[in-house]
Amino acid sequence: MQPGGAPDMSALLAQAQQMQQQLMAAQQEMAQAEVTGQAGGGLVVATVKGTGEVVGLQIDPKVVDPEDVETLQDLVIGAIEDASRKAQEVAAEKLGPLAGGLGGGLPGLPGF
């Protein structure tokens, strides 16, 4: 802070720019990260990018039963949900420290 309690705007701007760069780097890491989720003890495995995009699905032939399509559908949904949950955990892990840095806002600027 400068004399009189006014915030040092150049320091605040530098801090904001640094946080923006860190956020962009974390977002890039998330976009490249892939996580897998499974259901049925690994009979169905889904691969999801950190962005939530489903990029892979493996189904063990043992679980394919034309007489019981509903079970296969449930397993696919379960595997995708598991992978999506893990992708959200990765996002929280990568973005959490940055969000914590924003928790106090920008000192000296109300509403930020």
Swiss-Prot record:
<keyword id="KW-0238">DNA-binding</keyword>
<keyword id="KW-0963">Cytoplasm</keyword>
<dbReference type="Pfam" id="PF02575">
    <property type="entry name" value="YbaB_DNA_bd"/>
</dbReference>
<dbReference type="GO" id="GO:0003677">
    <property type="term" value="F:DNA binding"/>
</dbReference>
<comment type="subunit">
    <text>Homodimer.</text>
</comment>
<dbReference type="GO" id="GO:0005829">
    <property type="term" value="C:cytosol"/>
</dbReference>
<protein>
    <recommendedName>
        <fullName>Nucleoid-associated protein RER_03900</fullName>
    </recommendedName>
</protein>
<dbReference type="InterPro" id="IPR036894">
    <property type="entry name" value="YbaB-like_sf"/>
</dbReference>
<comment type="function">
    <text>Binds to DNA and alters its conformation. May be involved in regulation of gene expression, nucleoid organization and DNA protection.</text>
</comment>
<comment type="similarity">
    <text>Belongs to the YbaB/EbfC family.</text>
</comment>
<dbReference type="GO" id="GO:0043590">
    <property type="term" value="C:bacterial nucleoid"/>
</dbReference>
<dbReference type="InterPro" id="IPR004401">
    <property type="entry name" value="YbaB/EbfC"/>
</dbReference>
